[in-house]
């Protein structure tokens, strides 16, 4: 059931009231939201579902990550400067702002400097400035230090917890009047009769696993807006539908992804070097696998350790989680971790398609910002500053149209907002003039060149980086989508992994417990299998159940059923919302949909 609203860790309850038309008003200084939810509960699963209650905003933003919150903050800054008032709402499926955020992370403060120039004075949690970069090529037992590539230099950048930065951004947004609602999972895009986006709906709560309504059933809400900004992060569940409805990917290449698996450790003080940034290529990944590791020495003797595995791999027996365990047994890494304590674990997919995989960004009534659109600099292993910049640009493009429509309605004394869709074409136009576009275009050939192998890819990447600087007349292709890359199990060699030692390496369930993930068990499974027979005939019989290995949370298992054949079991309570299954399933037979709001991981300083 829904909980009262506790924003960004504070004991602040958002207040609402019912208008004469029985619609929600989220604003402050009204009666308690919880009492209104009580008024729309229903006590029998046999009752016909009523219409959703609704509310009207100027802008609704889906996702309280760096892109969504930057959009909200810039809109409020522009409103204040112009003496206007815009009602801006941010909905977040995590239990609090930041609870679903996982990143390395080393942050380039360029976009933050633009958004909030006095961020230091306001206490932004950018604490550890990078002091040294190191770059290694690893073999099974050795490490060869190489010159750090130009684009991987981190002078002036900060080792951060992106979750903590996002929590701080949420506080800044709220202080400016942005309405931020965690535990609200956007489950549906709403459309006007003319096909334009008119907002989103949150999912119903209190539906039992068998589909019946519990005594705590609560209808979802419609959040209508002049403009809806989708900032869902990598592989957004609503964004997938928008790609198809508005043909947003017709003129770009398929996106390609990586799976990032991360642990935070507290290590011995004598082994800690605050401000040190290490990136590696090579071991534990074989030459045909794309990816690499990162080791970031943050404050308080903590180290952020992670491995990114390209999801365009072909061997269905590959297990990214086990590859990460292998990394920790490398002498350079193991020596650092010995005597330390693993504090947190998590996983999340990352866009790696780059420049050639960026979709169309605007459509009637809406826009895409940040990682949901694929803005990640692969060589730099960074995306948060791009997320923030795209949010800033989207807000600046939208603001004049929002105010113009608002003023027009006031002149005509309209009671209801206009249904004329906003189309903020200025956003992609300004983006193409920005440093984001320039930088992504410059490195567009780096990721696809690695398909030639690690060493040839590094040589070509060096030529691109130092000689051509992105000015080559060609653009390399990312090739087939990741889900089409797997080879049949019969053509591949099984991979044997060592048992965990419980000190440096861990069994999967021990790690999952460190993520804090949790879901209401009595709810429909949110990982939908469209056709279970396809899963059996393709996933099980041809690829030997790859979802049991590519999932970094142990959600999927093939277990012997009553008829003696293996059946697919989904332990969705363990789900980390990483979206790997949605991406890598060979026939795109698995769909990630949002569970009840507030479910999923509860990442702390990840």
From Swiss-Prot:
Keywords: 4Fe-4S, Electron transport, FAD, Flavoprotein, Iron, Iron-sulfur, Membrane, Metal-binding, Mitochondrion, Mitochondrion inner membrane, Oxidoreductase, Transit peptide, Transmembrane, Transmembrane helix, Transport, Ubiquinone
EC number of this enzyme: 1.5.5.1
Domain of life of the native organism: Eukaryota
Main subcellular localisation: mitochondrion
Cofactor(s) required for function per UniProt: [4Fe-4S] cluster; FAD
Gene3D superfamilies: 3.30.70.20, 3.30.9.90, FAD/NAD(P)-binding domain
Transmembrane intervals: 448-468
Positions annotated to bind [4Fe-4S] cluster: 551, 575, 578, 581
Keyword Nucleotide-binding (UniProt): no
EC class of the enzyme, as a word: oxidoreductase
Tagged with keyword Transmembrane: yes
Catalytic activities: a ubiquinone + reduced [electron-transfer flavoprotein] = a ubiquinol + oxidized [electron-transfer flavoprotein] + H(+)
UniProt GO MF annotations: 4 iron, 4 sulfur cluster binding; electron-transferring-flavoprotein dehydrogenase activity; metal ion binding
Endpoints of the signal sequence: none
Localisation: Mitochondrion inner membrane
Binding residues annotated for FAD, in chain numbering: 59-73
GO cellular component labels: mitochondrial inner membrane
Comment on bound cofactor: Binds 1 [4Fe-4S] cluster.
Cited function: Accepts electrons from ETF and reduces ubiquinone.
Family recorded in the similarity comment: Belongs to the ETF-QO/FixC family.
Quaternary state and interactors: Monomer.
Protein name: Electron transfer flavoprotein-ubiquinone oxidoreductase, mitochondrial
Organism of provenance: Dictyostelium discoideum
Lineage: Eukaryota, Amoebozoa, Evosea, Eumycetozoa, Dictyostelia
Encoding gene, per UniProt annotation: etfdh
């Amino acid at each position: 059931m829904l909980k009262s609203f506790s924003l960004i860790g504070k004991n602040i309850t958002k207040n609402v009231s019912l208008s004469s038309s029985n619609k929600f008003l989220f604003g402050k200084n009204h009666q308690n939201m919880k009492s209104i939810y009580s008024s729309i509960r229903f006590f029998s699963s046999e009752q016909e579902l009523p219409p959703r209650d609704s509310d009207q905003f100027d802008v609704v933003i889906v996702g309280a990550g760096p892109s969504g919150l930057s959009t909200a903050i810039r809109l409020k800054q522009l409103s204040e400067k112009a003496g206007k008032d815009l009602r801006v709402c941010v909905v977040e499926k995590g239990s609090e702002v930041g609870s679903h955020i996982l990143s390395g992370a080393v942050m380039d403060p360029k976009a933050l400097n633009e958004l909030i120039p006095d961020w230091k004075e306001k206490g932004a949690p950018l604490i550890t400035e990078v002091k040294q970069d190191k770059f290694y090529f690893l073999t099974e037992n050795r490490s060869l230090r190489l010159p750090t590539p130009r684009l991987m230099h981190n002078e002036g950048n900060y080792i951060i917890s992106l979750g903590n930065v996002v929590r701080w951004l949420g506080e800044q947004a709220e202080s400016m009047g942005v309405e931020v609602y965690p535990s609200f999972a956007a489950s549906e895009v709403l459309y006007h009769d003319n096909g334009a986006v008119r907002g989103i709906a949150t999912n119903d709560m209190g539906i039992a696993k068998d589909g019946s309504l519990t005594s705590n059933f609560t209808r979802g809400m419609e959040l209508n807006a002049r403009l809806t900004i989708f900032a869902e992060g990598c592989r957004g569940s609503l964004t997938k539908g928008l790609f198809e409805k508005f043909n947003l990917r017709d003129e770009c290449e398929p996106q390609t992804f990586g799976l990032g698996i991360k642990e935070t450790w507290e290590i011995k003080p004598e082994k800690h070097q605050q401000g040190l940034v290490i990136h590696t290529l090579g071991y534990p990944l074989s030459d045909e696998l794309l990816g690499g590791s990162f080791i970031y020495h943050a404050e308080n003797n903590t180290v952020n350790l992670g491995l990114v595995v390209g999801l365009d791999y072909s061997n269905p027996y590959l297990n990214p989680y086990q590859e990460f365990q292998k990394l920790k047994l490398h002498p350079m890494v193991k020596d650092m971790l010995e005597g330390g304590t693993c504090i947190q674990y998590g996983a999340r997919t990352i866009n790696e398609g780059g420049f050639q995989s960026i979709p169309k960004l605007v459509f009637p009534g809406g826009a895409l910002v940040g990682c949901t659109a694929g803005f990640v600099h692969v060589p730099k292993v960074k995306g948060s500053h791009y997320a923030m910049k795209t949010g800033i640009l989207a807000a600046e493009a939208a603001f004049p149209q929002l105010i113009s429509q608002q003023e027009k309605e006031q002149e005509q004394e309209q009671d209801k907002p206009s249904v004329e869709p906003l189309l903020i074409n200025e956003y992609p136009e300004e983006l193409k003039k920005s440093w984001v576009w320039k930088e992504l275009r410059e490195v567009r050939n780096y990721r696809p060149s690695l398909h030639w192998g690690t060493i040839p890819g590094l040589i070509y990447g060096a030529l691109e980086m130092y000689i051509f600087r992105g000015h080559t007349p060609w653009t390399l292709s990312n090739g087939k989508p990741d889900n089409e890359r797997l080879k049949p199990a019969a053509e591949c060699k099984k991979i044997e992994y060592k048992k965990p030692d419980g000190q440096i390496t861990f069994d999967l369930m021990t790690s999952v417990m460190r993520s804090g993930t949790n879901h209401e068990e009595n709810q429909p499974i949110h990982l939908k299998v469209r056709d279970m027979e396809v899963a059996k005939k393709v996933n099980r019989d041809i690829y030997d159940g790859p979802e049991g290995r590519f999932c970094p949370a142990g959600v999927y298992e093939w277990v012997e059923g009553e008829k003696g054949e293996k059946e697919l079991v989904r332990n969705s309570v363990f789900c980390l919302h990483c979206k790997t299954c949605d991406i890598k399933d060979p026939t795109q037979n698995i769909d990630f949909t949002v569970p009840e709001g507030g479910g999923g991981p509860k990442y702390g300083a990840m």
